[in-house]
Amino acid sequence: MNLKPLNDRVLVKRLESEEKTAGGLYIPDTAKEKPSRGEVIAVGPGKTADDGKVIAMTVKTGDVVLFNKYAGTEVKLDGVDHLVMREDDILAIIQ
């Protein structure tokens, strides 16, 4: 299935969190928090300003981003969990 976000929305695939702590302890699945970073899979054209002009998106396909763990709406594409969120929900681009 192919999904194209509209306006200022972004399709993000969550990146799995680490399974081991810095001290070498393994974290069970029940104790893991939802990852708050992911890879941008698709972006919309941008937000429309009051004067009708489209404001270009800052993020682009392939960017790794940081977002609030409660951001976006969860969708399942081809059996894989993704998020559709507004660009404003993205806190930073990880470089």
UniProtKB/Swiss-Prot annotation:
It is found in: Cytoplasm. One of its GO terms (biological process) is chaperone cofactor-dependent protein refolding. Keywords: Chaperone, Cytoplasm. Transmembrane segments: none annotated. InterPro entries: Chaperonin_GroES, Chaperonin_GroES_sf, Chaprnonin_Cpn10_CS, GroES-like_sf. Its main location: cytoplasm. One of its GO terms (cellular component) is cytoplasm. Pfam families: Cpn10 (PF00166). Belongs to the GroES chaperonin family. Heptamer of 7 subunits arranged in a ring. Interacts with the chaperonin GroEL. This is Co-chaperonin GroES. It comes from Oleidesulfovibrio alaskensis (strain ATCC BAA-1058 / DSM 17464 / G20). The gene is groES.
